[in-house]
From Swiss-Prot:
The keyword Transport is annotated on this UniProt entry: yes
Residues spanning the membrane: 239-259, 265-282, 293-313, 411-431
GO molecular function terms attached to this record: serotonin-gated monoatomic cation channel activity
Regions annotated as coiled coil: none
Protein name: 5-hydroxytryptamine receptor 3B
The organism of origin for this protein: Mus musculus (Mouse)
Chain ranges on the Cytoplasmic side, renumbered to this chain: 260-264, 314-410
NCBIfam families associated with the record: LIC
Principal location class: membrane
Name of the gene: Htr3b
C-alpha cells in the first residue's frame, strides 16, 4: 500500500513538472539565443563585404530650446530615427510562433557610427537601450535628442529675423562604399512636417529641407545628409516692448514742435523726453541680442532716434538763444537814447532856450522863471516820446524777429519730419528685405 502511494505521488509530481513551462524553452528566448549566440557586433552585418549598408535617416524638429547669438549656438530638441538592415538578424517567423518583431539591446548589436558635424556640446538624450528588429533583419533605432549645434546666426533684421541652421549627418569612419545614407521618408513630407513642433515658443518652424550629397576628402568619399532647419522669430513681444515705446516717444517729441519757439517749457519738455528715452534704452539693452559680426537694425534704430531727440533739443536751444540775444541787444537802445545829450540840446534849440555861454540881464531872468518850467516840461515830454517811440521800434523788431523765428522753426520742423520719415521708410524696407532673405 505504501509502495502504491509512493508511485502515485511520483507520477503526480512528474505530470506537474512536465506541465510547467520553462523560461528557457519559450519561442522568444530560443529566437534571442539563436540570433545572438554567434553574433559579432564588431563586424558590419553583410554577407558580401563589397555591398554597402544603407542607413535610412529621418528627423523631426520638436522645439527650439535656446538661440545663443553671442556664442553662435542653437539648441534644439529633435526626434531622430535611423533604420538599417542587419543580414545576420533575420529568421523564419513560422518556426518561432509567428514572431515578427522583437526588441534587442543596442549594445549587443552592430550600429552605424553616424554623427552630426555641427555638434559643439555633449549629446543629451534619454537612455533607450533597446531597438526593434523584425524578421527580415531591419533594425529601427528611434530616440529623442537635444542637439547643441554651431550655427551662423544673423541678427541684422532682429526682431524680424529668420535663421537657417543645418544638421549634417555622416559616418565618421566608413566611406560611401561601406555605409551609404538614404531618406526614410519623402523629402516633401520631411519639409512640411510641423505636427510635433511646439508653436508656443519664441520661434516658429518654417521648413526642414533635406539634401543628399557625397563629401570628397583625402580619406575617401563620405555620404552626407543635411537637414536645413529654417526658423523665424515671433516678433510680437519685441515690437510691443521695444519698438512701440520708441515710436510713442518720437511722436511726443514731434508734438513738442507745436509749442511756441520762445516758450522755455519747450526745452524742459524735450529734455524730459530725452532723459526718459535714455532710461528706457538702458533698461531694455538686455533684450537686444549682442553679436560681434554685425549690429542689428534695431540698435541703429535706437541710436538714430536718440540722435534725432538730441537734434530736436539743440534746435530749440538755438532758437531761444537767438531770441534772447535779440531782446538783450534791443533793451540797451532806450538807455543810450535817454542818456544822450543830443535830444536835450535839440529840445532846447527848438524851444528857443539860450546857450550856456550867453549871459542874460536880471530883467530877463525874472521873466524866464515860468518859461523855464514850461521848457523843462517840454523837454521831459519830448524825452518820454522818444523813449516810447524807441520802444515801439524795438517791439516791432522783436515781432519781426519772432516771425522770422517762427518761419525758421517751421522750416526746421519740416526738415526734421522729412528726415524722420525717410529714416522710417528706409528702416522698414531693410527689415522687410532681410526678413525675406
Amino acid at each position: 500500500m505504501i509502495l502504491l502511494w509512493s508511485c502515485l505521488l511520483v507520477a503526480v509530481v512528474g505530470i506537474l513538472g512536465t506541465a510547467t513551462p520553462q523560461p528557457g524553452n519559450s519561442s522568444l528566448h530560443r529566437l534571442t539565443r539563436q540570433l545572438l549566440q554567434q553574433y559579432h557586433k564588431e563586424v558590419r552585418p553583410v554577407y558580401n563585404w563589397a555591398e554597402a549598408t544603407t542607413v535610412y535617416l529621418d528627423l523631426c524638429v520638436h522645439a527650439v530650446l535656446d538661440v545663443d547669438v553671442q556664442n553662435q549656438k542653437l539648441k534644439t530638441s529633435v526626434w531622430y530615427r535611423e533604420v538599417w538592415n542587419d543580414e545576420f538578424l533575420s529568421w523564419n517567423s513560422s518556426l518561432f510562433d509567428e514572431i515578427q518583431e522583437i526588441s534587442l539591446p543596442l549594445s549587443a548589436l552592430w550600429a552605424p557610427d553616424i554623427i552630426i558635424n555641427e555638434f559643439v556640446d555633449v549629446e543629451r538624450s534619454p537612455d533607450l537601450p533597446y531597438v526593434y528588429v523584425n524578421s527580415s533583419g531591419t533594425i529601427r533605432n528611434h530616440k529623442p535628442i537635444q542637439v547643441v549645434s554651431a550655427c551662423s546666426l544673423q541678427t541684422y533684421a532682429f526682431p524680424f529675423d529668420i535663421q537657417n541652421c543645418s544638421l549634417t549627418f555622416n559616418s565618421i569612419l566608413h566611406t560611401v562604399e561601406d555605409i551609404d545614407l538614404g531618406f526614410l521618408r519623402n523629402r516633401e513630407d520631411i519639409e512640411n512636417d510641423k505636427r510635433a513642433f511646439m508653436n508656443d515658443s519664441e520661434w516658429q518652424l518654417l521648413s526642414v529641407s533635406s539634401t543628399y550629397h557625397i563629401r570628397q576628402s583625402s580619406a575617401g568619399d563620405f555620404a552626407q545628409i543635411r537637414f536645413n532647419v529654417v526658423i523665424r522669430r515671433c516678433p510680437l513681444a519685441y515690437v510691443v516692448s521695444l519698438l512701440i515705446p520708441s515710436i510713442f516717444l518720437m511722436l511726443v517729441d514731434l508734438g513738442s514742435f507745436y509749442l511756441p519757439p520762445n516758450c522755455r517749457a519747450r526745452i524742459v519738455f524735450k529734455t524730459n523726453v530725452l532723459v526718459g528715452y535714455t532710461v528706457f534704452r538702458v533698461n531694455m539693452s538686455d533684450e537686444v541680442p549682442r553679436s560681434a559680426g554685425c549690429t542689428p537694425l534695431i540698435g541703429v534704430f535706437f541710436t538714430v532716434c536718440m540722435a534725432l531727440l538730441v537734434l530736436s533739443l539743440s534746435k530749440s536751444i538755438l532758437l531761444i538763444k537767438f531770441l534772447y540775444e535779440e531782446r538783450h541787444s534791443g533793451q540797451e537802445r532806450p538807455l543810450m537814447c535817454l542818456q544822450g545829450d543830443s535830444d536835450a540840446e535839440e529840445s532846447r534849440l527848438y524851444l528857443g532856450a539860450p546857450r550856456a555861454d550867453v549871459t542874460e540881464s536880471p530883467v530877463h531872468q525874472e521873466h524866464r522863471v515860468p518859461s523855464d518850467t514850461l521848457k523843462d516840461f517840454w523837454f521831459q515830454f519830448r524825452s518820454i516820446n522818444n523813449s516810447l517811440r524807441t520802444r515801439d521800434q524795438i517791439h516791432q523788431k522783436e515781432v519781426e524777429w519772432l516771425a522770422i523765428l517762427y518761419r525758421f522753426d517751421q522750416l526746421l520742423f519740416r526738415i526734421y519730419l522729412a528726415v524722420l520719415g525717410l529714416y522710417t521708410v528706409t528702416l522698414c524696407s531693410l527689415w522687410a528685405l532681410w526678413s525675406r532673405m
